[in-house]
Amino acid sequence: MANQVIKCKAAVAWEAGKPLSIEEVEVAPPKAHEVRIKIIATAVCHTDAYTLSGADPEGNYPVILGHEGAGIVESVGEGVTKLKAGDTVIPLYIPQCGECKFCLNPKTNLCQKIRVTQGKGLMPDGTSRFTCKGKTILHYMGTSTFSEYTVVADISVAKIDPLAPLDKVCLLGCGISTGYGAALNAAKVEPGSTCAVFGLGGVGLAVIMGCKMAGAARIIGVDINKDKFARAKEFGASECINPQDFSKPIQEVLIEMTDGGVDYSFECIGNVKVMRAALEACHKGWGISVVVGVAASGEEIATRPFQLVTGRTWKGTAFGGWKSVESVPKLVSEYMSKKIKVDEFVTHSLPFDQINEAFDLMHAGKSIRTVVKL
């Protein structure tokens, strides 16, 4: 099958705001420096829902969504040297070419090698590998894991431990790595510190895990859904608060609770008003607030400059700052040695033909992560 078109099932988004449709698609063989992967498991993330809603400025249709997956290499294109058929892999929405100025700079993980084409839903050569009913279907985030087979650039693949359970480690393709790295790499949380985590979904729980790993003495979870508090405490939150329980702004509540503010705060929702609250909940002189959530297109953040003049830092992170190709295998190893939690994030498991239910569970706030098995 290596040089042939594969016919398989995929969940196609024909247009914004409509449920995904399970279709038979054709997946072309990998071209030079591309890899075709048989996807074994994929999770559904808020970013997929964000694009499907129509709010994503890079949302193009028809498209195969999905970016939190894991699978086995089926075949490789010409010039691929670091991967071979049979390798166990996680596709990466942030690549690591190792050559661009971003990859060569230790301060960032934002490889730009294929950014332009990836943003258009195309492979690096400007074309797609997917067709359905005679129509070209676009790629998504360079990964498109909602398909039994997908084609990705060879710089967008992490080769991982073949013994790793793919229905678990697929989560390391986005949410867990993003939150965990926000605490360790972006904030650089210090032992004995106080942290506040806004938004207790999968990413927020991963931030809590990272804060705890870094030795934070106090971790305050913040969410308007109190049903999320028990799980947040299982992950390491010392206490949880609901902004709706207070008559004053949540930043004032946190400042009073922590003798002047928290050392580190994290916004894991994508709400610009919450981003402001997270910054203003930080301690004068040294507080750091990390924006992790993705806001809707066109949204702007605001605060008084005095907040920054008086020593607070506002920063953001993508994929937790991890340089992807080299870091994801290490994160899988940390999971395999029980250093980090992954299983605990999986609240539901569904067969592929019920993938739309995964979105329903997420919108209802009933799931942390739903894993879909292909």
Swiss-Prot record:
InterPro entries: ADH-like_C, ADH-like_N, ADH_3, ADH_Zn_CS, GroES-like_sf, NAD(P)-bd_dom_sf, PKS_ER
Coiled-coil stretches noted in the UniProt entry, renumbered to this chain: none
Residues involved in Zn(2+) 1 binding: C45, H67, C174
Residues with N6-succinyllysine modification: K233, K315
Binding residues for Zn(2+) 2: C97, C100, C103, C111
N-acetylalanine, modified sites: A2
Keyword Ligase: no
Disulfide bonds, paired cysteine numbers: none
EC nos: 1.1.1.1, 1.1.1.-, 1.1.1.284
This protein's UniProt keywords: Acetylation, Cytoplasm, Lipid metabolism, Metal-binding, NAD, Oxidoreductase, Phosphoprotein, Zinc
UniProt-annotated location(s): Cytoplasm
Short name of one Pfam family: ADH_zinc_N
Molecular function as annotated in GO: alcohol dehydrogenase (NAD+) activity; fatty acid binding; formaldehyde dehydrogenase (NAD+) activity; identical protein binding; S-(hydroxymethyl)glutathione dehydrogenase (NAD+) activity; S-(hydroxymethyl)glutathione dehydrogenase (NADP+) activity; S-(hydroxymethyl)glutathione dehydrogenase [NAD(P)+] activity; S-nitrosoglutathione reductase (NADH) activity
Main localization of the protein described in the UniProt heading: cytoplasm
Cofactor(s) needed for function: Zn(2+)
Residues carrying Phosphoserine: S247, S324
Catalytically driven reaction(s): a primary alcohol + NAD(+) = an aldehyde + NADH + H(+); a secondary alcohol + NAD(+) = a ketone + NADH + H(+); S-(hydroxymethyl)glutathione + NADP(+) = S-formylglutathione + NADPH + H(+); S-(hydroxymethyl)glutathione + NAD(+) = S-formylglutathione + NADH + H(+)
GO cellular component, one term: cytosol
Cofactor stoichiometry and binding remark: Binds 2 Zn(2+) ions per subunit.
Quaternary data: Homodimer.
Function description: Catalyzes the oxidation of long-chain primary alcohols and the oxidation of S-(hydroxymethyl) glutathione. Also oxidizes long chain omega-hydroxy fatty acids, such as 20-HETE, producing both the intermediate aldehyde, 20-oxoarachidonate and the end product, a dicarboxylic acid, (5Z,8Z,11Z,14Z)-eicosatetraenedioate. Class-III ADH is remarkably ineffective in oxidizing ethanol. Required for clearance of cellular formaldehyde, a cytotoxic and carcinogenic metabolite that induces DNA damage.
Record-given protein name: Alcohol dehydrogenase class-3
Organism listed in the record: Bos taurus (Bovine)
Lineage: Eukaryota, Metazoa, Chordata, Craniata, Vertebrata
